[in-house]
């Protein structure tokens, strides 16, 4: 079952309130971020946990326990996953985690963004870019690398819907604009 956006938002709000009440904002934020990445492109796993015909509920809940408890995933997140399994709505887990991450980020003086590049960037390079962006916007920045083949060279960083463009393509566009402006 696919949940509506307002229901997904309610789940994220509930988990956010628990995180604040139990003073575990940072822990749940880190875990939400990791789980979002872990569940990306894991359609078969999500289907097994979502659809009743695949396995009975006890087996699906055991899969949750076996898979996530070994990584010390927060008990409240685990319980939310189990309820989603019961509701046959585990397909929404990643969306709920994304909303949760967004809400917790606001509370933790942190933000997430994307660094676009023509090829994959090393973890060390991402960390260096994160540090520079953190200084620039006075917030801790966590970046995810995504590939954009339209960039000619360089990188483009998007944080808070603001684009910081260091790509060759943007420089060429800027030169083109200046030439056209002078005509």
From Swiss-Prot:
Signal peptide annotation: none
Cellular component per GO, a single term: plasma membrane
A GO MF label: proton-transporting ATP synthase activity, rotational mechanism
InterPro entries listed in its UniProt record: ATP_synth_OSCP/delta_N_sf (IPR026015), ATPase_OSCP/dsu (IPR000711)
Keywords from the UniProt entry: ATP synthesis, Cell membrane, CF(1), Hydrogen ion transport, Ion transport, Membrane, Transport
Entry membrane topology: Peripheral membrane protein
Subcellular location field: Cell membrane
Function per UniProt: F(1)F(0) ATP synthase produces ATP from ADP in the presence of a proton or sodium gradient. F-type ATPases consist of two structural domains, F(1) containing the extramembraneous catalytic core and F(0) containing the membrane proton channel, linked together by a central stalk and a peripheral stalk. During catalysis, ATP synthesis in the catalytic domain of F(1) is coupled via a rotary mechanism of the central stalk subunits to proton translocation. This protein is part of the stalk that links CF(0) to CF(1). It either transmits conformational changes from CF(0) to CF(1) or is implicated in proton conduction.
Subunit structure: F-type ATPases have 2 components, F(1) - the catalytic core - and F(0) - the membrane proton channel. F(1) has five subunits: alpha(3), beta(3), gamma(1), delta(1), epsilon(1). F(0) has three main subunits: a(1), b(2) and c(10-14). The alpha and beta chains form an alternating ring which encloses part of the gamma chain. F(1) is attached to F(0) by a central stalk formed by the gamma and epsilon chains, while a peripheral stalk is formed by the delta and b chains.
Entry similarity comment: Belongs to the ATPase delta chain family.
Listed name of the protein: ATP synthase subunit delta
Gene that encodes the chain: atpH
